[in-house]
Amino acid sequence: AAEALHPLHGVSATFSVVIADPKTGICGAAVASKYPAVGKVVAYARPGVGAFCTQHWHNPKWGEHALDLLERGHQPEAVLGILLKDDPRRDKRQLAIINLKGRAANRNPANADPAGHYWGAMSGRFYACQGNTLTGREVIVAMAKACEETKGSVADRLMAALVAADCAGGDHRGRLAAGIRVCKPDVKGYWLEMHVDKSDDAVIDLLKKYNAANHPAKGQWKPGHRPFQHPCPNRPKPKAPNPR
C-alpha cells in the first residue's frame, strides 16, 4: 500500500501535444518540461498507428504498450481504460492518445499533486493537448489555438503548439527540456526526432534546431522565411499560479 503512494518512474510535470493527419498518415507528439530529457519518456508515436503521451506520474513502459493496443484496433478511449484499469496510480496519471483517423482521448490526474496545479486538457480536430504544473489555463488554450490555426505540416503544428504554450507561461518551474517525434507511414521508426535534454530555455533551443534543420517533415517555407521566430522573447519567468 505504501508503494502506491509513490511514482514508479518519475513525476514528469509538463505540457504536451499529439497530432495526426488522416490524409497523409503522419502523426507525432511534442513535449516540454522542467523534467530532464522529457521527450524520451513522455512522447511516443508509431508509423501507421498514432501517438501517445504519458505524464505527471509518467510510466514510460506504457509508451509502446499503448501503441500496441492502438495497432490492434482498440479505440483511443479504450486504450486509456485498459492502461488505467488495474493501475494503483491511475488518479495521478495524465494521458493523451490519438489514432490515424484523428480520434483523440485524454485523461487528467483526478488526484494531482498540489504542485501539479494548474492542470488541464483540450482536444479538437485531429489533436489533443494537455499539461500540468502550468502557470495557468491560458497555456492549454494557447496550445489548442495553435493546433487549430497553424498552417503547415504536422511537425510545424507540433512546434507551434510548444511555442504557444511557452509564450503563455508553460511549466511554472522552468524550461529545462523539450522534444518532438514525428512518424510517416513509409518510414520505419521516427521520421523526425529532436530533443533538448537540458537547457535554460529548452523550447527556444528546440525551436532553433528545428528552424536550422533541412527535413521534409517541415512545411513548405518560402525562401528566407522561418515561421517560428519566437513571438515573446522577453516573456517573464514562469511562476506558480496563486493558490485557490
Where are these regions (language model features)?
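N-terminal nucleophile
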Residues: 3-244
